Design a protein with these regions (language model features):
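N-terminal binding-site loop/beta-alpha segment at the start of enzyme catalytic domains
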Residues: 1-76, 138
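Beta/alpha (TIM)-barrel catalytic core signal, keyed to glycine-rich beta->alpha loops juxtaposed to Asp/Glu
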Residues: 120, 124-306
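Acidic-and-aromatic substrate-binding clefts and catalytic sites of carbohydrate-active enzymes
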Residues: 23-29, 49-59, 85-90, 121-125, ...
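Short, acidic/polar
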Residues: 26-38, 91-107, 153-157
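Active-site groove signature of glycoside hydrolases
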Residues: 104-125
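Short catalytic-loop micro-motif centered on adjacent basic/acidic residues
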Residues: 45-52, 116-117, 143-146
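A structural motif
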Residues: 43, 109-112, 142, 166
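Structural motif corresponding to the early beta-alpha repeats
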Residues: 71-94, 118-119
């Protein structure tokens, strides 16, 4: 398993984060088998959120590991997210604290290794967030903190009040959905890719040692589904298939390797409930695409080079 340094923590963590959004339909036995399959391949970093399957992803995960003496809490890194409620966002102090208590109860653990603010809340008071973080840290309920889907100035506003390091920012990123890369190359151009939609978040995170966690790594723009095997991205799939044959791996592995090749040292967040596909994503850790291969995939997705 390839390792990356997690923010300013200095901790070496797996490059592949096991996203648990789609695990809510598993039963206790199949969840236990899935956890073992991940951990045995070095993917012991699990990403949850309180809203995934209405909390069932966390609930079943907790049931699956707590009664298994071969799965020790200290051998897993558990991350979860809070702040999304039905029809609105809520990063109030009280709701953050309430959410964490619920997460801990469902996951059957006394602490989270990492808590992320799931999405920016227009009504969030950063001083309240700071109070919540202090309480959670001092109580031992949360060890590290990060954000998800936040722009640089939103993080800067938090950092004005929050004492703890913002360790991660979870952002959507795939070969087709890579404006934060395109924006950095189509500088001084009148092109779609030149539009700065995220405040140069890629460069900001690299400058501030914030680890980017790439979610939906196989997603097309506008949540239209997976690009692998999709005729809308025929040129991209042709190039992916060519490289998959060259490296003797699956197309999934090549698409994941494209993300891991970026020098920002991102983590890739999986979204699969399939042990086979999880293994294909983990296989990307042993593929090191060269520059020409990386750019050919980028261009095949419809991006341009000025």
């Amino acid at each position: 398993m390839k390792k990356v340094t997690l923010g300013k923590s200095g901790q070496q963590m797996p490059a592949v984060v096991v996203g648990c959004m789609r695990l809510g339909e598993k039963d206790k036995a199949s969840m236990n088998h899935f956890i073992h399959a991940a951990v045995e391949q070095g993917a012991y970093y699990f990403d949850h959120a309180d809203i995934y399957a209405g909390g069932m992803s966390e609930e079943i995960f907790g049931e699956a590991w707590i009664d298994d003496p071969s799965l020790r809490r200290e051998d897993m890194f558990l991350q979860s997210k809070c702040g999304i409620r039905k029809g609105y966002y809520d990063l109030s102090k009280d709701y953050i604290l309430e959410s964490v208590d619920g997460i801990l109860k469902r996951l059957r653990t006394e602490y989270l290794d990492m808590l992320l603010l799931h999405r920016p809340d227009a009504l969030a008071d950063p001083e309240e967030v700071a109070e919540a973080f202090d309480i959670l840290e001092k109580s031992g309920k949360v060890r590290m903190f990060g954000v998800s889907n936040h722009k640089p100035m939103q993080i800067e506003l938090l950092r004005k009040y929050v004492r703890q390091e913002i360790v991660t920012d979870q952002l959507q990123f795939s070969i087709p959905v890579s404006n934060m890369v395109a924006n950095g190359m189509e500088v001084n151009m009148e092109t779609a890719g030149s539009v700065d939609r995220d405040g140069s978040v890629l460069e900001y995170c690299r400058l501030n040692d914030i680890t980017i966690q790439a979610w939906s790594p196989f997603q097309m723009p506008a949540w239209k589904g997976c690009f692998l095997g999709n005729e809308e991205y025929a040129d991209l799939n042709k190039e992916i298939d060519r490289l998959a044959e060259q490296y003797n791996v699956s197309p999934t592995t090549i698409a994941a390797a494209w993300i891991l090749r970026h020098p920002a040292h991102m983590q890739i967040v999986t979204g699969t409930a399939s042990e086979e596909r999880l293994g294909e994503i983990i296989d990307a850790c042993r593929i090191d695409l060269n520059r020409e291969e990386w750019y050919r995939l980028y261009l095949a997705a419809g991006h341009i080079l000025p």
